């Protein structure tokens, strides 16, 4: 064969890698990882896969699958199982994301405490927990706790944080020999550059005024400033804490939570009509039209459903706080839906554990999940543009409580 027909494999590989094809990188990583684990498993068995040898001391017994997150992609890794004993690659454990390492440490803690459920047994097998010693679990937990503590107590120096959202999750934990519910308080905000941040996380016994007050005081002590609007549900303790610690900030009552509150106060047959009227308020093109439509909705409800009209009228100022800001960002600030999506991501991890062994493990796992989300937000696209953020801050100095504006000429109701 002449040289013109020879393939320069080294150059071919270099060319392929230069293309940065995700499929290629994923394939190369999968092949390398499989070969590495196969070699380690063969070493434990004393002979190669299916090799006849007098030195063989163990045999393969199938595989167990788990996801391995890498910068190239998430790879399905087939970990060799052995007939006697177990094999789990230490390097795979060390390379896990913070959130998965936190999950492993929490499950391992439950395992070492003797918690025995079908779900826990499956987790123990999947995560390779049986191979971890008590000292390894302790070291892993200590490292994660230090990282999470540094994250949740860091200075909030990227402000002003013009927009803030707060919510709480109820999680179960074992305390004093029984299972109790505790509240995990979470706050997010938009910094001066338009990126979302996780601002804080705390665990309290109850979602009361004292818990929220301590939470917001901690945020302020760490540097939280420039907050113009806080979006949340209408929990009395939360609203009171906002007023006490952020007196210059307006409060936006989450429209989604309010709709549920209004539905509870509305006769069931009338709810479809009332819901349509409520949605029509938010469908207006500008702040003036929103206020005018609010008046028309109240007029329409007063005669037929006076209690519903009173309920809506009482919530007026808090529901329309968003109108003080540019319309381009109304969807981001008039409800807690972005926060709820974050909560679902946290729930996806915490539901795996179910009942936590202690409060420290809650902070470890939830804190690790939030720290990863924080990094993704900071490294991703801006949540709000700089131009609209500038206009939002400027609007505060030129407009005061537009939701209280009165309309003299009210045309017919629109839906």
Swiss-Prot record:
Pfam families: Transposase_mut
Keyword Nucleotidyltransferase among record annotations: no
Keyword DNA-binding belongs to the record: yes
Key words, A-Z: DNA recombination, DNA-binding, Transposable element, Transposition
Domain of life: Bacteria
Gene Ontology process terms (BP): DNA transposition
GO molecular function: DNA binding; transposase activity
Role played: Required for the transposition of the insertion element.
Sequence similarity: Belongs to the transposase mutator family.
UniProt-recorded name of the protein: Transposase for insertion sequence element IS1081
Protein source organism: Mycobacterium tuberculosis (strain ATCC 25618 / H37Rv)
